[in-house]
């Protein structure tokens, strides 16, 4: 194969080329009312099935990425908008990493990948699409895949 193309990421990539952060609908990543997209998802007003939220805990939740690097790409994040790890309370920190552990186990059980990437992009320069709201990526990987982008 000469080229691997993740067509489902086109709206995201083309939005970056235009200097705009977009979600699957092409809308900005904020909620239109000063909240980040993740804060809107955390509130749960739009229904979990419609917004791809797969788990809710007291301080954190998990959501399928609408621009997945691979099938099964999840994000785990605190409900509260926090830019980096040092801004988390102890309760949020513990639940975040416990949820990441559970997300990895779920991905491994459901998809049987050859491995899993777990990563956090802290700040726009590090690749964070929504730098004001920490999120941990859980990305299933298979031998020979080359579609990992940050």
Task: Kindly give the residue locations of the regions a language model identified.
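Histidine-centered divalent-metal-coordination microenvironment in nucleic-acid enzymes
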Residues: 73-78, 96, 123, 127-148
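Long, well-ordered alpha-helical scaffolding segments within enzyme catalytic domains
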Residues: 89-113
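A short glycine-rich, hydrophobically flanked beta-strand micro-motif that places a catalytic Asp/Glu
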Residues: 111-126
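Short acidic, glycine/proline-rich loop/turn micro-motifs
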Residues: 86-89, 149-150
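Active-site microenvironments that recognize anionic phosphate/pyrophosphate groups
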Residues: 1-71, 76
């Amino acid at each position: 194969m000469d080229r691997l193309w993740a067509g489902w990421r086109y709206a995201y990539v083309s939005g970056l080329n235009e200097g705009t952060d977009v979600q699957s609908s092409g809308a900005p990543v904020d909620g239109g009312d000063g909240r980040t997209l993740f804060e809107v998802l955390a509130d749960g007003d739009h229904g979990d099935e419609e917004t791809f939220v797969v788990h809710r805990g007291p301080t954190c939740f998990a959501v399928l990425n609408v621009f997945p690097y691979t099938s099964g790409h999840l994000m785990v994040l605190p409900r509260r908008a926090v830019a980096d790890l040092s801004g988390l309370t102890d309760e949020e920190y513990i639940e975040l990493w416990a949820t990441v552990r559970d997300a990895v186990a779920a991905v491994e059980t459901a998809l049987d990948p050859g491995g899993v990437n777990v990563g956090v992009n802290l700040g726009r320069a590090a690749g964070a699409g929504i730098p004001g709201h920490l999120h941990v990526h859980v990305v299933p990987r298979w031998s020979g895949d080359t579609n990992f982008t940050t």
